[in-house]
């Protein structure tokens, strides 16, 4: 990946944070604020990871501790998002157990980047989208689901590399703004 692409990744990860912050301040809803907290826990780590990758500071751009911390914070944000969309302590506890297991695996000395570390994150992201279905909020579920997978399509390593020249990660970050908006809209509709 080119330095310019990593710098663009660092900038575009700020968009979901700005979107969520504006919505949290506008709605003054506790659950939306929890979404913001999860987003703000992940954003500085992701921004730093991409910035340092752009500066060539990682011996291995993919398999390094800052990348593991970035993925760890994604798992943490997912747990917070799950509580925000479900309001269920029981369901959030189940999600927390799943994510804690995969956080442990991320940091285990024998874990390497075999190209599959993103799979548990993708699975876990559906935990916080399912409550939208449970309350029959089909419109916001479809927007959240489709924006997640639309961005994810561009971020898929072989597609990103072969068809988008490495710029697909930026598209994923931008799609997360739409994704976050749909989550907030669902929370507000349920309030």
Label every model-predicted segment.
Residues 1-191:
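Multi-pass alpha-helical transmembrane bundles in non-GPCR membrane proteins
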């Amino acid at each position: 990946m080119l330095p310019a692409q990593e710098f663009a990744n660092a900038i575009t990860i700020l968009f979901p944070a700005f979107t969520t912050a504006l919505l949290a301040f506008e709605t003054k809803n506790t659950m939306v604020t929890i979404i913001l907290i999860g987003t703000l826990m992940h954003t500085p780590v992701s921004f730093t990871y991409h910035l340092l990758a752009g500066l060539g500071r990682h011996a291995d751009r993919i398999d390094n501790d800052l990348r593991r911390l970035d993925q760890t914070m994604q798992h943490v944000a997912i747990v917070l998002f799950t509580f925000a969309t479900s309001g269920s302590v029981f369901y959030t506890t189940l999600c927390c157990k799943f994510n804690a297991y995969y956080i442990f695996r991320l940091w285990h000395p024998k874990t390497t980047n075999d190209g599959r570390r993103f799979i548990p994150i993708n699975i876990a992201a559906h935990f916080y989208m399912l409550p939208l279905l449970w309350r029959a909020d089909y419109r916001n579920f479809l927007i959240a689901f489709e924006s997640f997978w639309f961005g994810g399509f561009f971020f898929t390593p072989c597609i990103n590399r072969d068809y988008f020249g490495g710029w697909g990660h930026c598209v994923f970050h931008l799609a997360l703004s739409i994704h976050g908006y749909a989550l907030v809209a669902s929370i507000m509709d349920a309030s």
